[in-house]
Amino acid sequence: MSRIVTIFALLLASSLSSFGADSAVRVQLDSTKASPRSVESLTEQVILRDYRFAWTSIAQALEFNTLDPLEGAFTGESKQVLSQSVTSQQRTGLSQRYVDQNHKVQAVFYAPEGDVIELHDTAEYQLQILDGGKLIHEEHVVVHYIVLMTPAADRWMVRHQQAVPQF
């Protein structure tokens, strides 16, 4: 019996971690106009990786109503706001699914000390609202985000993320 439970747990974990969110997050980063400091190639690659991971984490947290995916990708105000969103969803029984995410990101400010980068993200995706797992609403959305990322020990973290009407 315990072997069956173990196999089921592994299959469930595998399906949750491979559920479409990660593969559906596409990010294009243009850092050519960042100032006053230019973004080094390796830094650009790491920011691209970590920003994609952040959106994968948002999608998983809001779809499965769990705070775990927010660890490591977010800090400060951004983590607090996302945690409140997940907690609110847990109370209401609703969840959100982000499908076919496409992010066109432009680095506009990179601090001379290299301790903060400002990104402008035009995000496009299908937003699905679910009630107890049942789809109740779906719409195609385009949202503009201003994002501040700061370096941590081994990655860049989203410190602030705010939707704005336009850049």
List PLM regions with ranges:
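Intrinsically disordered, low-complexity segments enriched in polar/charged residues with Gly/Pro
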Residues: 47-48, 94-97, 113, 134-137
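Residue-level detector of secondary-structure transition/capping positions
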Residues: 55, 78, 125-127
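Amphipathic, hydrophobic N-terminal targeting peptides for secretion and organelle import
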Residues: 1-33, 163-165
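Exposed beta-sheet edge and beta->alpha loop/turn motif
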Residues: 112-167
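Short, low-complexity N-terminal intrinsically disordered segments enriched in polar/charged residues
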Residues: 20-76
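Short hydrophobic/aromatic segments of transmembrane alpha-helices and their interfaces
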Residues: 3-4, 51-53, 139-141
